[in-house]
Design a protein with these regions (language model features):
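Hydrophobic hinge/microswitch elements
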Residues: 6-64
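A late-sequence structural motif
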Residues: 8-9, 64-106
Length: 109
């Protein structure tokens, strides 16, 4: 199970699979990551997910990580109007690197 080719991370996943010598049989491609996870949790196949959702996947779906995709990262951009962000995960995402306050957050898969 993979994100569609429209997803920015898909090219990096395809490159990683090629470098690892893995030629998967793609059972489905998904625009929506929640739908991808739901199909994966139902036993339809393996799927990539960011490290940040690992514990949620285990507790919500009983899904375990098979292996990390070394070198594959996903970038997130957060845009908000609220001056004081209260949600802890959003606070973590918005915490800028010391050298660039406009840099996106990069998360390993």
């Amino acid at each position: 199970l993979l994100p569609t080719s429209h997803a920015a991370v898909r090219g990096r996943i395809d490159h990683w699979l090629e470098q690892a010598g893995i030629r998967p049989t793609v059972a489905g491609e998904f625009e929506d990551s929640a739908l991808l996870k739901t199909f994966g949790a139902s036993g339809m196949g393996l799927f990539p997910a960011t490290e940040w959702v690992r514990q949620d996947l285990l507790s919500r779906y009983g899904v375990h990580r098979l292996a990390p995709c070394e070198g594959v990262t996903e970038r997130f951009f957060a845009i908000g109007t609220e001056r004081k962000v209260r949600h802890p995960l959003v606070q973590r995402l918005l915490r800028p690197p010391l050298h660039d306050s406009l840099a996106p957050v990069t998360v390993p898969l």
